[in-house]
């Protein structure tokens, strides 16, 4: 029976012999594109929550994050997102219970996490009762997103040798950053456009001072 230090020495020697994968060579694998597209399509959701939630609270409820209630709401939001730390443990639980390999267990965990952000769809209707409801729901969505994101990062180690992990992770991070930038820009333009238009008899028209006053009469009747 070999001693542990001898086995470790063999592994270390084998790792040294691994040929490093070139940066451009990484793009020749479909797994790279799968990871990059996954980051491109999803990273913007996290930054959307972080960037627009304070504006949402101010616009919908008149709550500023510089005030006590605003600080409490934002603190609650971030505290809930910390649940994502536990999300990294779910694949291990699945492996222990089902015997699946790590990659398959991560895929199953990511499928579970993907459903949780749907609760954010209830933020707007429940917001009519209290600002705490949307904050809690957005926090749950953010926590699920970060759990999903942590697991997609881990899949890189499942699919590629150690010498390629840094390059593949960097490619995915770049794709996620570009996707996030595009989403925030599009969202901002959409908000500006929506605030300047309205619907009358099913037709889109430009918002005017008179229409704003008419709408205010319904919201705040005399």
What is each stretch, according to the model?
Residues 66-67, 162-171:
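Loop-to-transmembrane helix entry/capping segments in MFS-fold secondary transporters
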Residues 24-89, 125, 141-157, 180-188, ...:
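Extracytoplasmic gate region of multi-pass secondary transporters
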Residues 16-20, 33-37, 72, 108, ...:
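Alpha-helical membrane-protein architecture signal
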Residues 103-151:
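C-terminal transmembrane helical hairpin of 12-TM major facilitator-type secondary transporters
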Residues 72-76, 137-138, 168, 172:
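Hydrophobic positions within alpha-helical transmembrane segments
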Residues 66-67, 102-108, 189-222:
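A membrane-interface helix-boundary motif in multi-pass transporters
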């Amino acid at each position: 029976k070999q001693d542990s230090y001898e086995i470790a020495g063999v592994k270390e020697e084998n790792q040294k012999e691994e040929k490093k994968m070139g940066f451009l060579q990484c793009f020749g694998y479909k797994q790279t594109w799968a990871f990059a597209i996954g980051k491109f399509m999803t990273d913007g959701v996290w930054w959307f929550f972080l960037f627009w939630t304070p504006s949402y609270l101010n616009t919908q409820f008149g709550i500023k994050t510089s005030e006590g209630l605003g600080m409490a709401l934002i603190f609650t939001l971030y505290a809930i997102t910390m649940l994502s730390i536990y999300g990294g443990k779910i694949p291990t639980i699945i492996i222990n219970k089902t015997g699946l390999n790590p990659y398959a267990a991560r895929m199953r965990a990511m499928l579970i996490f993907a459903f949780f952000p749907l609760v954010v769809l209830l933020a707007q209707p429940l917001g009519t009762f209290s600002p705490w409801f949307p904050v809690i729901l957005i926090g749950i969505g953010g926590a699920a997103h970060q759990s999903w994101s942590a697991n997609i990062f881990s899949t890189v180690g499942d699919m590629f040798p150690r010498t390629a992990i840094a390059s593949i992770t960097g490619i995915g991070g770049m794709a996620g950053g570009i996707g996030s930038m595009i989403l925030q820009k599009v969202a901002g333009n959409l908000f500006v456009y929506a605030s300047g238009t309205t619907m009358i008899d099913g037709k889109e028209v430009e918002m005017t001072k008179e229409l704003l006053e008419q709408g205010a009469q319904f919201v705040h009747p005399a």
